[in-house]
Amino acid sequence: AKDVXFGXDARAL
């Protein structure tokens, strides 16, 4: 996943 500002990884969401 790419950095989307939330924890650095879109997989976190």
Curated annotation (Swiss-Prot):
Name-wise, this protein is: 60 kDa heat shock protein, mitochondrial
Q: Name the lineage.
A: Eukaryota, Metazoa, Chordata, Craniata, Vertebrata
Any idea what job this protein has?
Chaperonin implicated in mitochondrial protein import and macromolecular assembly. Together with Hsp10, facilitates the correct folding of imported proteins. May also prevent misfolding and promote the refolding and proper assembly of unfolded polypeptides generated under stress conditions in the mitochondrial matrix. The functional units of these chaperonins consist of heptameric rings of the large subunit Hsp60, which function as a back-to-back double ring.
**Top-level taxon of the source organism:** Eukaryota
| EC number(s) per entry | 5.6.1.7
Example of a GO MF term:
isomerase activity
* Listed GO CC annotations: cytoplasm; mitochondrial matrix; protein-containing complex
Q: Quaternary structure? A: Homoheptamer arranged in a ring structure. The functional units of these chaperonins consist of heptameric rings of the large subunit Hsp60, which function as a back-to-back double ring. Interacts with 2 heptameric Hsp10 rings to form the symmetrical football complex. Interacts with HRAS. Interacts with ATAD3A. Interacts with ETFBKMT and EEF1AKMT3. Interacts with MFHAS1.
Main subcellular localisation: mitochondrion
Family to which the UniProt record says this protein belongs: Belongs to the chaperonin (HSP60) family.
- Enzyme class, broadest EC rank: isomerase
